[in-house]
Regions:
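Bacterial N-terminal signal peptides that target proteins for export
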Residues: 2-13
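Short, solvent-exposed loop/hinge segments that bridge or flank secondary-structure elements
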Residues: 33-81, 109-129, 151-158
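Edge beta-strand at a domain terminus
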Residues: 95-97, 140-171
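Short, surface-exposed loop motifs enriched in S/T, G, D/E and P with embedded aromatic residues
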Residues: 68, 87-95, 132, 164
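A short hydrophobic beta-strand element
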Residues: 40, 99-103, 134-145
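N-terminal helix-cap/turn-to-beta initiation motif at the start of protein domains
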Residues: 24-41, 167-171
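C-terminal motif of bacterial Sec signal peptides marking the signal peptidase cleavage site
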Residues: 19-22
Length: 171
């Protein structure tokens, strides 16, 4: 077979373009969980307690860190640690949205006054919904749940929202 230099260059160029196109598309659509992975720091956000006992302050998430770890192409696990909050939650990823399965929990400590006695109460939040929405290096969260403590004396329907960022390199 006798090929000219221009034929060889065109064939190599076409092969390289197909290779690069294939690599680019797999990282976007084939492994969406990889886009969530990294260390995220909350620039803003809070958990609003929404309890039957007045005066329980919101849990501020500002400055707290959430580490997101890729489990497989469509699943991530998260670890949110901060003052008064600890959450280890698993999510299913579709595109730029990750959704938590119900039945998972977060642990929060809250200062409360019950019967005139001030105390700190450990509260387990049962997660009803929790989504992570990714836009570049910004992650928005939205969570709803239910919680009880002190034998049902404290009853809450907490919500959370916030925005976290990571270094442009993906953290």
């Amino acid at each position: 077979m006798n090929l000219t230099k221009s034929s060889v260059v065109r064939a190599c160029g076409a092969a390289a373009a197909l290779f690069l196109f294939g690599c680019g598309s797999s990282s976007i659509t084939g492994d969406p969980a990889a886009n969530f992975a990294g260390s995220w720091t909350f620039a803003s956000g809070s958990i609003q307690p929404m309890c039957n006992i007045a005066g329980i302050p919101a849990v501020d998430l500002t400055g707290d860190t959430m580490t997101v770890t890729r489990v497989d192409p469509t699943h991530v696990s998260t670890m949110l640690t901060g003052t008064d909050v600890m959450c280890n939650v698993n999510f299913t990823v579709t595109g730029t949205t990750a959704t938590a399965a119900t039945g998972q929990t977060c642990a929060v400590t809250a200062p409360v006054t019950i019967g005139g006695v001030a105390m700190t109460v450990a509260v387990k939040i049962d997660i009803s919904t929790w989504t992570l929405n990714l836009s570049g290096d910004t992650l928005a969260i939205a969570m709803t749940g239910t919680a009880t403590a002190e034998g049902g004396l404290l009853s809450c329907t907490p919500t959370a929202d916030g925005s976290a960022t990571r270094p442009a390199s993906g953290g």
